[in-house]
A protein has these predicted regions:
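Bacterial N-terminal signal peptides that target proteins for export
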Residues: 2-11
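Bacterial N-terminal signal peptides
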Residues: 10-20
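Boundary at the C-terminal end of the N-terminal hydrophobic targeting segment
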Residues: 21-25
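Flexible loop/hinge segments at secondary-structure junctions
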Residues: 26-399
Length: 399
């Protein structure tokens, strides 16, 4: 009887500790299902739109970046017809999509923009099956690329049109690397992240092309803190890795940026997904990652930054190479793309080798990349505007 009593007491204690940790790491309640959103099927486009309506309607930042280095939009032709755009629901849920449409149609009255912005998951399929002229999404998955190539004979072309948000959940809030507050480490390189989160591999991918030159052996694995230069009691301790379930786009983005788009992860990696707790609240994957790193002195995780991000874990500065420079996560370093883990959204279009880009697509993309287009994005106040170098890179793709 004493044993059962002890076990019961232990269970209650553990449950209390877990609840405290969950509450401490919980994101703002405005991201939780509400009375109105619960009227619709969980996870549906309309449920998500209803749940995020208040966030979508208002700017999250009011600062103004210097966009004087971006080109003014000047029409280079006046094509006519309907321009069909599919994908990213957050552009349609916020005022941004409407602002872009209204401003562009005044400058190009012969073009009518027709949106179908329900989810980024449909962007590449719509493009592949000729249901759209532009798909708006992040980097496609391997099977998005593959299905497109099977149908079209080539892969879609992406042109970056915006930078993900600093901390607005849904608007591609960007990734940070976190460790336990007691960890003395302050910085990490992309090469070291590969060693920590990855494992031996035979190669890697760019779209649907396999690259054996991305191979690496087990000697580049980093499995203890001492391998990162940490001294003291932590030096010989194993590194415990945390992040998103490998079925999430965030895990694919991290793999694309750090692991050469492979599926070879550290054998101790724990990935998390959203689930509904008994109280009806969603325990978000980001909160689970943060809670595990907070409670594990040996832990490191990648996680999307969000409002009310806890102060009792440490965010590491990140560099492209071991030599640096190591860059702090901030709105400025995201916007100028000096932070190595920055992410964005792209217009994905069909460019047939040897043929010009559809003039309707070309003109609208030029408008979005222009100072006028990026000023509207900045006015919306969630996504961050592009820097001049990224804009010029996109314009070159259209030529």
């Amino acid at each position: 009887m004493q044993r059962h009593s002890t076990l019961a007491s232990t269970a209650v204690l553990l449950s209390s500790l877990l609840c405290a940790a969950v509450a401490h790491g919980q994101m703002d309640d405005k991201y939780q299902p509400n009375a109105e959103s619960k009227k619709y099927p969980e996870g549906s486009s309309i449920e998500r739109r209803t749940r995020m309506a208040a966030i979508a309607a208002n700017p999250a930042y009011t600062r103004k970046f210097d966009l004087s280095g971006l080109p003014d939009y000047k029409p280079e032709g006046h094509p006519t017809g309907i321009l069909r755009i599919c994908g990213n629901n957050y552009i349609g849920d916020s005022p941004l999509g409407g602002w872009w449409k209204d401003a562009f149609e005044k400058l190009q009255p012969g073009i009518t923009i027709q949106y179908d912005l329900q989810t980024a998951a449909t962007a590449i399929p719509c493009l592949a099956f000729d249901k759209a002229d532009i798909g708006i999404t992040h980097e496609p998955s391997f099977y998005d690329y593959l299905s497109y190539q099977r149908l079209k004979g080539h892969t879609p072309t992406g042109i970056t049109i915006l930078t993900g948000s600093y901390d607005v959940v849904g608007w591609q809030n960007n990734m940070v690397i976190v460790v336990n507050k007691a960890n003395p480490l302050t910085k990490i390189s992309m090469t070291q992240l590969d060693g920590i989160f990855g494992s031996q591999r035979a190669g890697g991918w760019i779209a649907t092309t396999w690259h054996p030159e991305f191979a690496r052996g087990p000697e580049r694995d980093i499995r203890t803190w001492g391998q990162l230069g940490v001294t003291g009691p932590l030096a010989d301790k194993p590194i415990d890795t945390y992040g998103y379930s490998l079925r999430y786009a965030t895990a694919l983005e991290f793999s694309d940026k750090v692991l050469h788009s492979t599926d070879k992860w550290n054998e101790n990696f724990l990935g998390f997904g959203n689930y509904t707790k008994p109280d009806g609240k969603t325990y978000l994957e980001a909160d689970q990652i943060v809670d595990h790193v907070r409670d594990d002195p040996n832990g490191i995780g990648y996680v999307r930054y969000h409002p009310k991000f806890p102060t009792d874990i440490k965010i590491l500065d990140v560099a492209e190479t071991d030599a640096g420079p190591f860059v702090h996560y901030s709105m400025d370093t995201l916007q100028d793309h000096s932070y190595p883990l920055w992410g964005g959204q792209s217009f994905w279009i069909d460019i047939v080798p040897g043929r010009p880009v559809d003039p309707k697509i070309r003109e609208f993309t030029r408008f979005v990349l222009s100072r006028q287009g990026q000023e509207l994005l900045q006015k919306d106040g969630k996504y961050l505007p592009l820097d001049a170098a990224t804009v010029q890179e996109g314009l070159k793709t259209l030529r």
